[in-house]
Structure formats: C-alpha cells, structure tokens
C-alpha cells in the first residue's frame, strides 16, 4: 500500500468521506525518503515499543511497525479510525487507541497495550510522532512533568519551536521550553523538512528533533517545584529573576535574593541568561527548605 502517494491518500480519504481538519493540525507527510529518515533517526530496534501520537492515516505507522516490536498509536479524531483500520489493520503489532494524548497517562496505556512489558514497572519506550503543531509544547512538557518511562523522543514539529527547544542561554528565544527540554534531555535538530512534502502543505517549515532523555530521580514534588519556578521566572521576561520570582510567587524580594545567591544565581540576571542546571539547583533549595 503506497500511502506516501498524495493520490492514494486522497482516494482513501474520499472513500471514507473525509476532509482534513485544520483545527486538529492534520497535515500528512507523504515523502517516503523523509519518513524513512525519521525512523532511522529514532534508532528503533526489534526489541522496542513505540508510542506514536497523531498517526493520521497511518503513513508513518507502517514504517514504525516494520522497525519495532510494538506500536501504540494515539489518535484523537474518531473519523480517522476507519482509515487507520484500512491502512494498518493487517499489522499484528499495531494498536490504535482513540484518545486525546494530552489527557491520558502514557505509561498506563503502554503497559495495558503491551501486557505490562513496557511502561510503569516495565521497560522504557520510545515516542515517535509527527505532532500537531497546536499540541507540541503541551505534549513535550507533559512527558517531562509526569516523568514517564520514555528513553527517547523523535518528533516532527514547527521549525520555530525546534529552534526554541535547542536555543542556548542568552538567546532571545531561550525560554521555559528550552530549559525543560535541555534539563531533562539532550535535544538535537536532526532533520529540516520543507512544507511541500505534506498533504495538505502547512503554512510553516518543519523540523525533526531527537530527544535523548537523561536519567534522573526527581520525585513528583521536585518536578512540580522545578516547573513552577521555571514558569514563574519566564512569566515576565524583561524583569530580573528576583523580581519575576517574588512577583509571580508572592514572596518578599530580599528572601528571594538570598535564596538565589545561595545557589549561585545573581539576582539581577534575567531568566533567559540562566542555564537549566541553575534552575534545578534553585528548585532543590526550595524543596529542601521553605519557599
């Protein structure tokens, strides 16, 4: 089944009386070379389980199924389920789950669909996805905030978001997403993708980012505090870190400055000048004492 042909895709969608939803960010990748590159960059083995978010018509899904032991595909659009049944129904290692990926527990779903082999107390799994642009940041934050048992992510996204994720301290586009991604993983842009290889073409250029997740033992409380501090710090970018934190968290300025100095952060710096590791040290000081 030549799913990477726009003509074939149009025929399948027409057969099911479907039109693509702009609101759900439905843009199907139809270039076989780029699809194969995504699978290659994901470094999938026959012992791996892959969580795919937004399989669409199953174009990438079929290639993932060739490389992995299991593929669990999460699709929000009920109208696409008959399409996926047609395009992936012959694959014995693919399960399609109709759900909003922003609202489900990834570890639980993976454990349920792999007989407990992956997720929770099982082995780590991979995430590979051509993400809907509107959900990119929420889904990435979700993985890091929840501490899911994910070893790597290979994600197609808007090029602008990819550049924010990999931006370094001091850059105008370095922000809370940069801090989260670079503290919990090692993100790299591994592929740039033109808009012309999608059906229908989006209005922006895309890029594929490969995230290699770092091992850490943060508790739920520590993760919560880390993200609370990072978001508060970037809430008012033009202010100093001391002003931002004292204002957003309703704390006395002199107390905030004292804590910042204790962990080696100058109170007159702005959030965009502070590396991820410094935010971690700050969150640890807060967890260990009073905030």
From Swiss-Prot:
GO terms for molecular function: 16S rRNA (adenine(1518)-N(6)/adenine(1519)-N(6))-dimethyltransferase activity; RNA binding. Belongs to the class I-like SAM-binding methyltransferase superfamily. rRNA adenine N(6)-methyltransferase family. RsmA subfamily. It catalyses: adenosine(1518)/adenosine(1519) in 16S rRNA + 4 S-adenosyl-L-methionine = N(6)-dimethyladenosine(1518)/N(6)-dimethyladenosine(1519) in 16S rRNA + 4 S-adenosyl-L-homocysteine + 4 H(+). One of its GO terms (cellular component) is cytosol. Specifically dimethylates two adjacent adenosines (A1518 and A1519) in the loop of a conserved hairpin near the 3'-end of 16S rRNA in the 30S particle. May play a critical role in biogenesis of 30S subunits. Its EC number is 2.1.1.182. It holds the Pfam family RrnaAD. It comes from the Bacteria. It comes from Carboxydothermus hydrogenoformans (strain ATCC BAA-161 / DSM 6008 / Z-2901). This is Ribosomal RNA small subunit methyltransferase A.
């Amino acid at each position: 089944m030549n799913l990477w042909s726009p003509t074939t895709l149009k025929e399948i969608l027409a057969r099911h009386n479907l039109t693509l939803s702009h609101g759900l960010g439905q843009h199907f990748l139809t270039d076989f070379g780029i699809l194969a590159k995504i699978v290659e960059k994901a470094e999938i083995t026959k012992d791996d389980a892959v969580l795919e978010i937004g399989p669409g018509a199953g174009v990438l899904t079929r290639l993932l199924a060739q490389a992995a032991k299991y593929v669990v595909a999460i699709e929000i659009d009920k109208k696409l389920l008959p399409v996926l049944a047609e395009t992936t129904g012959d694959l014995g290692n693919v399960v399609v789950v109709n759900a909003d990926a922003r609202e489900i527990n990834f570890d639980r779903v993976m454990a349920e669909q792999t007989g407990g082999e992956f997720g929770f107390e099982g082995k780590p799994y991979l995430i590979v996805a051509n993400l809907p642009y509107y959900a990119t940041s929420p889904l990435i934050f979700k993985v890091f905030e929840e501490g899911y048992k994910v070893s790597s992510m290979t994600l197609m996204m808007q090029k602008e978001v990819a550049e924010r994720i990999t931006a370094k301290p001091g850059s105008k586009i370095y922000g809370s997403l940069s801090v989260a991604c670079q503290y919990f993983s090692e993100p790299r842009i591994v592929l740039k993708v033109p808009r012309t290889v999608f059906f229908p073409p989006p209005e922006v250029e895309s890029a594929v980012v490969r995230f290699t997740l770092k091992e850490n033992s943060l508790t739920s409380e520590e993760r919560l505090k880390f993200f609370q501090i990072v978001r508060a710090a970037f809430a008012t970018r033009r202010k100093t870190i001391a002003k931002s934190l004292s204002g957003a968290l309703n704390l006395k300025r002199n107390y905030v400055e004292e804590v910042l100095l204790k962990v080696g952060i100058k109170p007159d710096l702005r959030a965009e000048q502070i590396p991820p590791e410094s935010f971690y040290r700050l969150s640890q000081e807060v967890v260990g004492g009073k905030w």
